[in-house]
Amino acid sequence: LIDKLYPLYLNLHVKARFRLAALTPRYFVEMKEQYPESFIVKTYSLNGEIVGFRSFFLNENQLDAHFIGVNYELNREINLYQRILYDFVSDAIHAGSSELLLGRTAAEIKSTIGAIPHDLTCYIRHRNSLSNQIIRPFIDYLKPSDWTPRSPFRLGE
């Protein structure tokens, strides 16, 4: 199974605007071994072939979306990424979660299902002042890109 999931994960990883490092091919197996009850992976199949997956942590009152993988050749045709988002919402509701965390990427499409952004403040300071000057452009690069908030709800009625 991992030989099917890992390439789908890499499809998203290579498209990411910011990435620190790629996961190892055994990452999902190791997460399941470490967190057998709370770490969940669900796959999407078309004509018997796995075309996507999503992983998440199901904690006491919270569903925390983790990594996903998508076959981009089929994504436009079958709206796979959007389906994954709806399924995260469905799983959170069925689990009785009071909170669904979808992560910090792809904010615009997540807002189409009702996700609300929350500011995240991060302070980084090195002991060495020269290092602080070197770090500053990197920190500026981490700022989220501009996006247009959407809403699935009718506003102003």
Locations of regions flagged by a protein language model:
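Conserved acetyl-CoA-binding loop-helix of GNAT-fold acetyltransferases
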Residues: 75-90, 102
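Generic signal for short, ordered secondary-structure residues
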Residues: 7-10, 71, 88-89, 139, ...
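Active-site/acyl-donor-binding loops of N-acyltransferases
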Residues: 46, 95-157
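A conserved beta-strand-loop-helix scaffold within acyl/acetyltransferase catalytic domains
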Residues: 1-76, 157
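Short, hydrophobic/aromatic alpha-helical segments in well-folded domains
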Residues: 8, 24-31, 84-89, 105-109
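Short, flexible segments with low predicted structural confidence
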Residues: 3, 64, 81-82, 138
